[in-house]
Amino acid sequence: KEKYPNLPYFILGHSMGSFIARDYVATYGSEVDCVALCGTTGIFPNLAEGMKLCQEHIDEGKGDESDPNVAQILLGWMFQRCTEEIKYGNEWSCSDPIVVYNAANDPLCSILRPTTNRSYLYFCQMIEAITGPSWAEKVPKKLPIYNVAGDEDPVGQYGEGVKQVTQWLEDS
């Protein structure tokens, strides 16, 4: 804004980026002119259970380790859309097997790399902060927000999570 004061400042957040964008606008929303959220979600399934397990691992000194059970608790629900055998671990992300294969074999794609227990706890804390009417109350009322998702997007809970977020904003 300092370098280009006459240009509008937009944020586009997709999937996990939409969570970060929501967290950002709750604090700095007056600094942006518009937000587009693509594939965001409302109430995150199994959040409390995942947070508890992450905190237990951290308390045991295992914060920098990775427990696949944490990923299963927090993200396993996204695989419900998968009707075929799970080969790569990213099948939830797209119904096109070629896209799934290419992403799984892309050395720059980090979606399949292990995440530490501490990172998952930070993720859970962010999700907790952007969930519900208390989050929506922090977002500037006049900030235009475009909220979109596909009806086959598991992160957006097949459109239902996006509707929840929209409702929180409308109610605030």
Language-model-derived ranges and their functions:
Residues 154-164:
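Conserved alpha/beta-hydrolase "acid-adjacent" motif
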Residues 114-136:
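Active-site nucleophile elbow and catalytic-triad environment of alpha/beta-hydrolase enzymes
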Residues 139-145:
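Short, proline-enriched alpha-helix->beta-strand connector loops that line the catalytic pocket
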Residues 167-172:
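Catalytic histidine neighborhood in serine/cysteine hydrolases
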Residues 23-114:
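Alpha/beta-hydrolase-fold enzymes
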Residues 13-23:
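Glycine-rich nucleophile elbow surrounding the catalytic serine of serine-hydrolase chemistry
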Residues 147-149:
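Short beta-strand/loop motif that positions the catalytic acidic residue
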Residues 4-15:
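Alpha/beta-hydrolase fold nucleophile elbow
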